[in-house]
Structures are given as structure tokens and as C-alpha cells.
Amino acid sequence: MPFALGQRWISDTESELGLGTVVQVEGRMVTVLFPATGENRMFSRNEAPLTRVIYNPGDTVESHEGWSLSVEELTEKDGLVVYHGIHSETGEKASLRETLLNHNIRFNKPQDRLFAGQIDRLDRFGIRYQCQLLRHQLATSDLLGLQGPRVGLIPHQMWIAHEVGRRYAPRVLLADEVGLGKTIEAGLIIHQQLLTGRAERVLIIVPDTLRHQWLVEMLRRFNLRFSVFDEDRCVEAFADHDNPFYTEQLVICSLELLRKKKRLDQALDADWDLLVVDEAHHLEWTEEAPSRAYQVVEALSEVVPGVLLLTATPDQLGHESHFARLRLLDPDRFYDYDAFLAEENSYKDVAVAAEALAGDAKLSDAAINSLTELLSEKDIAPSIRLIQAEDIDSELQQAARSELLQELLDRHGTGRVLYRNSRASVKGFPKRIFNAYPHAMPEQYLTAARVNEMMGGRKTLEAKAAQALSPEKLYQEFEDNSASWWKFDPRVDWLIEFLKSHRSKKVLIIASGADTALSLEEALRTREGIQATVFHEGMSIIERDKAGAYFAQEEGGAQALICSEIGSEGRNFQFASHLVLFDLPLNPDLLEQRIGRLDRIGQQNDIQIHLPYLQDTAQERLLNWYHQGLNAFELTCPSGHVLYSEFAEDLLNVLVGGDEDELTNLLNHTQSRYKELKHAMEQGRDKLLEINSHGGDKAKAIVERLAQSDQDTKLIGSVIRLWDIIGVDQEDKGENSIILRPSEHMMFPTYPGLYEDGVTVTFDRDTALSRDDIALITQEHPLVQTGLDLITGSDTGTTSVAILKNKALPAGTLFLELIYMADASAPKSSQLYRYLPPTPIRVLLDKNGNDLSAKVDYTSFDKQLSAVNRHIGSKLVTASQPILHPLFAKGEEYAQAAVNELVAQAREKMTSQLTGELDRLESLKAVNPNIREEELEYLRNQMQELSTYLDASQLQLDAIRMVLVSHV
């Protein structure tokens, strides 16, 4: 390369250094100073990764003094270029030596990089275009936020998330029965709200014992990194901000923390967008004396726009408290309890009409009269005639039924505020089969119990019952903690034999404490060499993940997983169908939680529940109360908490030392009360609410679309190529999984989410659902989103030169492929992307300026191209400059015309959708007070704002590919 002192060059490998100046040429070496950073670089003259910077007539160059020159011509003297043209400030003719060019010039625009010889690899141009297409595809999907989470595609869950997640500041009560996935529904809504920009700051309030469960659930299922706040964290965060809640965007805390006035005041001042409250049935309220917990949530609900309340038992504390929770969501709508009761009584007529529409039979006269009265402001006669007709297409009849049903749902009931699915309305649950195994009480335990009784001591009734239910713990208190109770406990002998006879089955074992779980693992390992792993609260999240993964492995994995009560919270193992309850919890909700580890939607087999117990002990009496009184082993018991509250004292007395008559009396009373509560719940089922909550055919359609998206092989190929380009090392691990690690040749110094020790991922949803340690990769996953951002946010692939070997075209024929981006700057919360997302516009020009993009598709054209090295590419660009400059101007004309059309379509779509929704809600507001004025006002403001943003839409050249025909 010919070098001369003072010449300006740029580094091909370190473009961030800016414009360099040759300061020394000696022998075979050249030294370049980069004044913008003050750094020197020494290169071999023959192989220097440098590109000479020479501007052309028509370009604008900037001097180091800040003024610009419009270049008209250039001259060269002693190897240095002098630019001549018009001074930007004086308007007069001026000259500028290249040595006086601005050092900070960077070639960010594709045209500048192309003419400066900064030409990228051919495959990088392709991956950049694919990245822009993927971003556009994601932004335009009406299912945005539903595909990425690692959850099963359950229709009713996806329906609720789809309906609620799209709203501005949703305020709803999620009240599905146990096991139907309220946490997943809430997570899906949170994920949607964050991904679409409707929310940025989220506060989740949960019982103290569930903080960790929610933290794990949000991270593992939704890739959302929440922070758990307690008093210590608040004190620690005070160093960074006066209000600790401002130090994080996504926060989980307990209700106990917010009972403190100081912390509540700080939370009230923290500008949350969305508030989520789990176990909301604990919020007790009466008009005269609302509980402190209720007052805390009420204060927050008054200042936070979006509120999600979660409860499996909305009537647990009475119907008045249920009304109070609805009042938290919309105090204007639910202002009077008596009015609420009167309105509820009218729901029965609506439910009868809804059930008639939801079926297939012809409508009765009573149903028609009821519908006509309920929808009096609408002429429904044509729809009724269609439904009643004999020889009409069934699809048309079904459409008419669906339309009338939707009208009912819109106009009556609490459908927009309350969602509740029951096991009666959602199919797909397995049977629960209970097996009990009696064993004689060991003499060692009897001795420990006698010693304990002689020693006396003050203990509560509940503490005595807990001791009676876990004799091994009492035994260890007297013998010492290392006592090997498992060497004589007959339940352990039974467990070993059971596992040996079920070697091909995965078995989940749950015990009350971590010590018991660890002892059981030791017993299985030392006595029979049975592969088992433990899972308890003393382990870190990573350790629990590894244990769960070891249990989930089909080949070489653990046969049994032994969990403690707390350690198993939030984890589901529905790939197993055998559950061993080594002991029983005192609380019916905890029993249901244990069984719920396996009894979930998605469980493929009947669940076998095994309970080894000690005869004539508290264990047998509690078993009988659960089984005969509540039928809690074989069916879910929504009234379990109420029954325990009512019978707790009698139950504890029976457990500690009651006789058979007391037990029989307790069982009779419990059975009677259980039937009463069950009947009341059945009578209270709101059929209209259930129809609205599970979504019917619409929910199934959403799931089908998501399932099709999961099978998109094009997406998988694009993501794999993206990682290849970036330099991510990919190791096939088998079982549909890949291990990703940063390689030594990463294109970017950091890749957030990609750790040094690797990340295991899969594109298969079923694999991800069965393995907590494997991430599910979709286009919504942070690893994909980050990869797209790294490519599109850098200059990777913005310039490329290729050869087209085609003898049907004259050699030297030139094509210019231009990728423009149509975009409009707007806050993410405006949701402009729904109408005008960042859209790639492809223009393919021949040398005469004709756009061939409609005739020559990208994929077929790309397959015919061959790469050229950078130096040859740079020479070809230089030789083609006279042709290229006018083509760029022509390309922009075509692209601008396309943008104008896109903006017009976006405006029409926006106006049509929002006006239609506004008209619908305004008409509904007259008959359904559930429609909030805030929603209407939001839609009006959104239309005005979006119109302004569309007016400011922009066009930007994103990437260039110059193609020359060759016959060689």
C-alpha cells in the first residue's frame, strides 16, 4: 500500500478509533495516530487492515475547527488530498487539506462505510436483514408476549392472558380454582404488559412463604428478573436512593413489610404501573372494620393504574370480602354491597340464556324471551332465526350463537373484572387414586413419647399435634440429631420395597422437614443404593435446579426426588405420576399443594397417591379426617381452609389424645359441613362467568396459532445463524437441547444472558416444560432479543459486495440492493408498533434505476450470490461510484413512496380499530357499568397521540449490497 505522512486512514478492525493520520513510514512498517483517542497503532505496510479515506464530489466533509465543506472537486499533491468546494458558514469557495479533517468522524451511515471501503461479509448482510424481518414479525403479532414464556399451551390460561394483557392498566380478579394456573395467568399478563411497554414497574405482594416461589416462577417461566425486598434489603438500598423501591423496576415483597407505615409510604410513592396481589382471599373486609392487610392493598390500588388480584377461594372470608376485593378494582362500579347482591341475583337469568347459546340444541321459547329482554337495545331477531333454522350451514349458526353470547358477556355480569375457571368447566385433569399402607408403631417411638409426656413442659395444642404427627422428630430430640431413626421405622422399609418394585417409575416423595428428607435420601442410598436426590429450602436456586434436572432425566436420572414441604413450593413435576406422602401436613391447603406438584393440567397419567402411616396414632386419625371428612386425597377441596378453621380445635384435640367416639363425632360433623359447602359452591357457580373465563373456540384458536409458531423451522434456522454470526459456541447435547457458550471469537465483547459456563436451551416446548434447567427459545426470549439488538444496533452487515454468476446477463451488470427501515419514534407504551412497527423495505435497482424487488425475491437472489474479499469489494465500489450516487437517490424515492403507503395503511388501521373499540365500549357503558371511563379516555388520547407520531415517521437506509455480474 502506498503511504504518505499526513494521509487519513481508518482501521477496519477498530472503527471506533475514528480517523487516523499516518505519522511515520519506515521500512516495512507504518505508524498511524488516532487523535480522537490519542492511541498509536503500528502496522505492516503490506498487510495493514486499513482503508484510505477519500471523499468524492457531492460529499460533505467536516474540518477539525467544526465548519463543513460541500466537496465539488479534489486535487492531490505529494500523496495528500485537498478538497475544494463551498464553505458551510460563509457560502464562499474554500479548500480543506485532508490533514485538517475532523478526527472524530465515524462511518456509521451505510453509504459512508461503503465508500470508505468498510465492507462487511456477505452472510452478515443476510443475517442483518433477517434480524430486521424477525423484529417486524414479532412487533406485528397480536400474540406478542404469549409465545415466549415456558408454559404449556393451555386454552383458558392463554385466553385470559390474551384478553387481559392487551388492556391499558388492567384491573381484574383472577380466581381460578386450585391447579388451574392463576400464577401462570398473572405471569403471562405481566410478561405481555412489560414486552409491549404498557408497564415498566411492577410490584408483586405475596405471603412471606411464597416470595421465593414467585421469584423462581417469574425467572424460570417468564425470564423476568424480580428482586425480593425485605427489611434488610430496604435498609441496604437506602444507600442508593431515599426510596428503596426506586432501586429496582420489578419487585416482590410480603404484605408484612408493607404493614410498616414507612415502607408503605415509600411503596405508595414509587410510581408503579402494575400491582399484583397473591392470596387475595386473606384481605378481610367489613364496612365497619377493614383489616390492616386490606387497607394496605386499598391504598396501593388507589395510586397504581393496573391491579391483578389472585385467589383460588374468592368467598373464603365471606361474600362481603369478595365484594370488597372487587371494590379494590373499581370502587365506582362496586360502591354498595346490597346493590351488588341484587345485581348478582339477576345473573341467573343471564346464565340460563348463556348456557342455551353455548349448547347445540334449538333455543326454547323461554330462552328466546330471556335473550330478547336481556339484549333489548339490539335487534337480535335475525340471529335467532338463523340459530333456529333447520337447513342452514352449521358454521353460520355457530357464528350467530357466538355473536349473541359475546353480546351477553359484554353487557352483563363481572366478565371484564372477574375471571374464574373451575375443574368442572376445564377438562384434562387426571384421576387421583389414594393408597394407604398401615404399619405398627415402633417401640422406640412409643418410648420417646412416654419420656416426652413425663417431662411435661408447656406446649400449644398445635405443637403437641405436630409432634404426634412426626414421631421421628421427637425421637431425635431425645437421642440426638444424628440418630438413625430410619433404621427401624417401618415406613422406610416400605418405601425401599416400593421403589424396588417400581424401578421404571419416577416417584416424588414429600416430607414435612428438610432433616427428614435428607435422612430418607441417606437411607435409600446406604441401604439399597437407590438413586434419589433431595430438594429442600436450604439449597440455592441453582442446586434445586440441578436436583430437579437429575430427577427429570429419563436415562441415568434419579428414580426418586425427596422434597421438604417448603422446598417443593412452586415446583411442578407432572412428568411423574407416583406421589409418596411420607407424613401429613396439618393444613388442608398444604396437602393440596403437595398433591398439586403432580396434579396439574398436562399430567398424562392418573396420579397414584401413596401414604404409609403408623396405626393407632395421630397419623391415622388425620388421614381419616382428610379422607372421610374432606375427601381431600381423591378430589380437590376448595372448602378445606374453611373446614379447618371451623374444626381446628376439635381436630387438634382428637390428634393429641381423643378417643374413637370423639373422632367419629368429628368425622360426622365434618362430612355434613363439607356437603353443605360443596352444595353452596355448586349453586353459586356463575355459568356466564365460566363461559367468559375459558374462552371456548377462541381460546383453542389462540393455542393452535401458538403451536404452529412453535413448529416454525425458519425461525430456528434464523436464530442458529444469528448465533453463528455472533460467534456463540453451540454444542448439541441431545434430548432436543443445545449448550450455548461464548467463544473466543465473539463479535461483541458482552452478550447479556450468555454466561461463561454456558446456557442449555431448546426449541421444543415439551422438553423445556420437563426440565427446569433448559431454557425455551422463541423469538421473545432475551437471548434472541439481545442477539437481534446487538446486530441491528451495530453496523454489522450494513455494507456488502457480491458477485452474481449468471451468463444470461452481460458481465459487469450492476445491481444495488438497498434495505430501508420505516420507523416512527414514540414511547413503547404508545403501542405504535401495532400499526407501524419498524418495517424493512427492500429495493433492488438495476443500473437504470428500475426497482426489481417485486420480480426478484430476496431468497432466490441471495442463493445465487458469491462473496468477494474486502479489498476487491472496495475496488469494485470505487470503480462503480459514478453509477451508485444517482441510484441511491432513486432508491430513496421508491422507499419513501412505500413509507407513505405504510403510514396511510397504519393510520387507517389505527383509526378503524380504535374508533370501533371506542364506539363499542361507549355503547356498552350504557348497559354495563363495568366499562371504566379511564379506558375510554385512554383510547381517545391514544388516537390523538398515535396520529401525531405517524406524522413524524422516518425513513432510514439500513443496509446496502452491491452486486456485479461475472462470468468467471
Swiss-Prot record:
Subunit structure comment from the entry: Interacts with the RNAP. Has a higher affinity for the core RNAP than for the holoenzyme. Its ATPase activity is stimulated by binding to RNAP.
EC numbers: 3.6.4.-
Protein name in UniProt: RNA polymerase-associated protein RapA
UniProt record similarity statement: Belongs to the SNF2/RAD54 helicase family. RapA subfamily.
UniProt-recorded Gene Ontology molecular function terms: ATP binding; DNA binding; helicase activity; hydrolase activity, acting on acid anhydrides
Enzyme class: hydrolase
Positions with a binding annotation for ATP: 176-183
GO terms of biological process kind: regulation of DNA-templated transcription
Domain Helicase ATP-binding as annotated: residue spans: 163-332
Gene3D superfamilies with a match to the protein in the record: 2.30.30.140, 2.30.30.930, 3.30.360.80, 6.10.140.1500, 6.10.140.2230, P-loop containing nucleotide triphosphate hydrolases, Tandem AAA-ATPase domain
Job description of the protein: Transcription regulator that activates transcription by stimulating RNA polymerase (RNAP) recycling in case of stress conditions such as supercoiled DNA or high salt concentrations. Probably acts by releasing the RNAP, when it is trapped or immobilized on tightly supercoiled DNA. Does not activate transcription on linear DNA. Probably not involved in DNA repair.
Domain Helicase C-terminal span(s) in chain numbering: 491-655
UniProt keyword annotation of Isomerase present: no
Keywords of the record: Activator, ATP-binding, DNA-binding, Helicase, Hydrolase, Nucleotide-binding, Transcription, Transcription regulation
Classification of source organism: Bacteria, Pseudomonadati, Pseudomonadota, Gammaproteobacteria, Alteromonadales
PANTHER family: DNA ANNEALING HELICASE AND ENDONUCLEASE ZRANB3 FAMILY MEMBER (PTHR45766), SWI_SNF-RELATED MATRIX-ASSOCIATED ACTIN-DEPENDENT REGULATOR OF CHROMATIN SUBFAMILY A-LIKE PROTEIN 1 (PTHR45766:SF6)
Motif (DEAH box): 278-281
PROSITE patterns according to UniProt: HELICASE_ATP_BIND_1, HELICASE_CTER
Native source species: Shewanella sp. (strain MR-7)
